[in-house]
A protein has these predicted regions:
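Conserved short beta-strand edge segments in small beta-sheet-based binding/regulatory domains
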Residues: 65-71
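Short, Lys/Arg-enriched N-terminal segments with co-localized hydrophobic residues
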Residues: 1-3
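Helix N-cap motif at beta-to-alpha junctions
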Residues: 50-55
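Extreme N-terminal starter segment of soluble prokaryotic enzymes
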Residues: 5-7
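Short acidic amphipathic segments
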Residues: 24-39
Length: 71
């Protein structure tokens, strides 16, 4: 049984709308990801997803874009 998960990934050095769109586009391409919303001021990425997507591969995608994961 697949179940939806909602997680928040906090990152460093998120400053502008261009970065926000870059991250949203990258994560939305992943199979299993339903929704991505980002709070620039908080440096928070909110993701709704189900299997086969998981928190590790979401964080890796963000890291591969050059962002440091805080927690």
């Amino acid at each position: 049984v697949k179940h939806m998960q909602s997680k928040v990934i906090y990152i460093a050095e998120l400053y502008n709308e261009k970065q926000k769109l870059q991250i949203e586009e990258r994560l939305m391409k992943l199979y299993g990801v339903f929704k991505v919303s980002i709070d620039i001021e908080e440096g928070a990425i909110f993701v709704d997803f189900e299997t086969p997507a998981n928190l590790n591969n979401l964080e890796k995608e963000v890291y591969d874009l050059g962002y440091k994961i805080i927690y």
